[in-house]
Swiss-Prot record:
Gene name of the record: bla
Catalytic activity, EC: 3.5.2.6
Binding, substrate: 237-239
SUPFAM superfamilies (UniProt xref): beta-lactamase/transpeptidase-like
InterPro entries associated with the record: Beta-lactam/transpept-like, Beta-lactam_cat, Beta-lactam_class-A, Beta-lactam_class-A_AS
Catalytic activity reported: a beta-lactam + H2O = a substituted beta-amino acid
Top-rank EC class of the record's enzyme: hydrolase
Keywords tagged on the record: Antibiotic resistance, Hydrolase, Signal
GO terms, molecular function: beta-lactamase activity
Function: Hydrolyzes broad-spectrum beta-lactam antibiotics. Active against cephalosporins.
PANTHER family noted in UniProt: BETA-LACTAMASE, BETA-LACTAMASE-TYPE TRANSPEPTIDASE FOLD CONTAINING PROTEIN
Organism: Klebsiella oxytoca
One record GO biological process: beta-lactam antibiotic catabolic process
Protein name: Beta-lactamase OXY-1
Length: 291
């Protein structure tokens, strides 16, 4: 009887070893990711913020996830989503045509500058803002919605009390260290992007439209997308500003895996520092390796 009991205990202990090893491996992996991100940040000479949400199990990988960063053009997603939200009760909203005057044009307006005679619909402006990062398109959306505070109010309506839009383009890209205007945190943005593209913050049709716009982005090839396997589907929105601020937020559909939501924000000490898209690509590779 004693021998049988000892054998049972030994078998149970042996069975537990792989679980303990697996658990230790998971923790080691998480620690390794943090160290790799810290090393990347140190090599890059700036401040890096990362938030990854794995929707397969709701796990999160965060690096400075609760620190504020200037959003720059990644905030255009929230403005476009606010327009889409209005179209749930009034489908014709997206077809509303807005006049575009020469005096409306600001720096980097590759699409709107071609429509001074015809104007553009809110749907066209949303696409221009998201897929080409057209700044005048963003300003026209903000104006239609009633000002930056209305975009912030929409963010709050979906549970995001961190996001704040205070100015229009291009002033919102000043990215002054310590300035809370036009900022959010990587985690807050990741949670909002998940709600907007994978959750129920928008109606089914509006959500599908937002995803389509993001997948058609033309500005993200060297950022998050560059750090992922080419076979993975990605919808993203980039951003850039002073102090070498370089941003990208993305929804990712890996092969044979639940979607991922990834936010990468990077900023530097010098006001005239150059954009560093390769840092975002490297961060994306670090946090998605092994999936």
């Amino acid at each position: 009887m004693l021998k049988s009991s000892w054998r049972k205990t030994a078998l149970m202990a042996a069975a537990a070893v792989p679980l303990l090893l697996a658990s230790g491996s998971l923790w080691a992996s998480a620690d390794a990711i943090q160290q790799k991100l810290a090393d990347l940040e140190k090599r890059s000479g700036g401040r890096l913020g990362v938030a990854l949400i794995n929707t397969a199990d709701d796990s999160q990988t965060l690096y400075r996830g609760d620190e504020r960063f200037a959003m720059c053009s990644t905030g255009k997603v929230m403005a476009a989503a606010a327009v889409l939200k209005q179209s749930e009760s009034n489908p014709e909203v997206v077809n509303k045509r807005l006049e575009i005057k020469k005096s409306d044009l600001v720096v980097w307006s590759p699409i709107t500058e071609k429509h001074l005679q015809s104007g553009m619909t809110l749907a066209e402006l949303s696409a221009a803002a998201l897929q080409y990062s057209d700044n005048t398109a963003m300003n026209k959306m903000i104006s239609y919605l009633g000002g930056p505070e209305k975009v912030t109010a929409f963010a709050q309506s979906i549970g995001d009390v961190t996001f704040r839009l205070d100015r229009t383009e291009p002033a919102l890209n000043s990215a002054i260290p310590g300035d809370k205007r036009d900022t959010t945190t990587p985690l807050a943005m990741a949670e909002s992007l998940r709600k907007l593209t994978l959750g129920n913050a928008l109606g089914e049709q509006q959500r599908a439209q937002l995803v389509t716009w993001l997948k058609g982005n033309t500005t993200g090839g060297q950022s998050i997308r560059a750090g992922l396997p080419a076979s993975w589907a990605v919808g993203d929105k980039t951003g850039a500003g002073d102090y070498g601020t370089t941003n990208d937020i993305a929804v990712i559909w890996p092969e044979n895996h639940a979607p991922l939501v990834l936010v990468t924000y990077f900023t530097q000490p010098q006001q005239d520092a150059k954009s560093r898209k390769e840092v975002l690509a490297a961060a994306a590779k670090i946090v998605t390796e092994g999936l």
